[in-house]
């Protein structure tokens, strides 16, 4: 299972939010590129970047910061936040982003997701950010009536390569992943699912291994890395491709 460090960018700085609340942001580094290099040095094989300003504004805001990171490192990067039209996604992929993450448009313009998946096969990820099973949009500032499972199934049919599932109530809280919701989603779609939100310890990461046979192929870790609750190198050793043993699928059931 791939351990993917998250770098959330707000006003050009590396921050973490609490439950997606822009009013509860904590700056961890003024220079996200330094953070990116640190995660690469610790063994990261992929980075997850979120343009928080972009998510709120509906357009890419921190493009220059993202480009600096891309020029600094040699591992794949996936980016989300404010990607709501073909031109914005195209520009992002042109500068070297491997995969673009769509959120709001999956709910508001599902036909655009189909178009983007056809234009950029294998490069479109759909981020499903859920609050009590319902999908949140526009930088988590609004909650729709769309069910997360139904959206996941629809996006898989439209050609999404992967789904990132974030439980908003757990994001930035270090309260552990929502295993039940992840299991339900993974069982309902035929494409890989990446877990996000709430990771607080190696135990949390190990608990996700029980879902790997269902298609949960990665986990995004944010606050726990920044507070030191999780050491990236240790996490990769514990659940990554080089781990020394598998955890039985029913170990944490």
UniProtKB/Swiss-Prot annotation:
This protein's UniProt keywords: Amino-acid biosynthesis, Cytoplasm, Histidine biosynthesis, Isomerase
Keyword tRNA-binding: no
Listed name of the protein: 1-(5-phosphoribosyl)-5-[(5-phosphoribosylamino)methylideneamino] imidazole-4-carboxamide isomerase
Pathway: Amino-acid biosynthesis; L-histidine biosynthesis; L-histidine from 5-phospho-alpha-D-ribose 1-diphosphate: step 4/9
Primary localisation category: cytoplasm
EC identifiers of the protein: 5.3.1.16
Any single GO CC term annotated in Swiss-Prot or TrEMBL for this entry: cytoplasm
Subcellular location: Cytoplasm
CDD domains: HisA
Protein's UniProt keywords contain Amino-acid biosynthesis: yes
Family the UniProt entry places it in: Belongs to the HisA/HisF family.
Organism classification: Bacteria, Bacillati, Cyanobacteriota, Cyanophyceae, Oscillatoriophycideae
NCBIfam families: 1-(5-phosphoribosyl)-5-[(5-phosphoribosylamino)methylideneamino]imidazole-4-carboxamide isomerase, PRK13585.1
Reaction catalysed by this enzyme: 1-(5-phospho-beta-D-ribosyl)-5-[(5-phospho-beta-D-ribosylamino)methylideneamino]imidazole-4-carboxamide = 5-[(5-phospho-1-deoxy-D-ribulos-1-ylimino)methylamino]-1-(5-phospho-beta-D-ribosyl)imidazole-4-carboxamide
Superkingdom: Bacteria
Biological process per Gene Ontology, one example term: L-histidine biosynthetic process
Species, as recorded: Microcystis aeruginosa (strain NIES-843 / IAM M-2473)
């Amino acid at each position: 299972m791939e351990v993917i460090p998250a770098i959330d960018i707000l006003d050009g700085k590396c921050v973490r939010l609490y439950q997606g609340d822009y009013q509860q942001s904590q700056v961890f580094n003024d220079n996200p590129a330094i953070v990116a290099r640190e995660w690469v040095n610790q063994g990261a094989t992929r980075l997850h970047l979120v343009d928080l300003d972009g998510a709120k504004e509906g357009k890419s805001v921190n493009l220059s910061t993202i480009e600096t990171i891309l020029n600094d490192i040699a591992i794949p990067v996936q980016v989300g936040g404010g990607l709501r039209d073909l031109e914005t996604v195209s520009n992002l992929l042109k500068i070297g982003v491997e995969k673009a993450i769509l959120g709001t448009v999956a709910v508001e313009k599902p036909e655009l997701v189909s178009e983007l998946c056809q234009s950029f096969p294998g490069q479109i990820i759909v981020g499903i950010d859920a609050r009590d099973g319902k999908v949140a949009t526009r930088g988590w500032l609004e909650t729709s009536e769309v069910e997360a499972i139904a959206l996941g199934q629809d996006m898989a049919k439209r050609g999404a390569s992967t789904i990132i599932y974030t439980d908003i109530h757990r994001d930035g809280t270090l309260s552990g992943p929502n295993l039940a919701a992840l299991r339900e989603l993974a069982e309902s779609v035929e494409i890989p699912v990446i877990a996000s939100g709430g990771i607080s310890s190696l135990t949390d990461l190990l608990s996700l291994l029980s879902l790997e046979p269902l298609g949960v192929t990665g986990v995004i870790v944010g606050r726990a890395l920044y507070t030191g609750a999780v050491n990236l190198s240790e996490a990769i050793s514990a659940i990554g491709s080089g781990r020394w043993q598998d955890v039985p699928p029913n170990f944490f059931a």
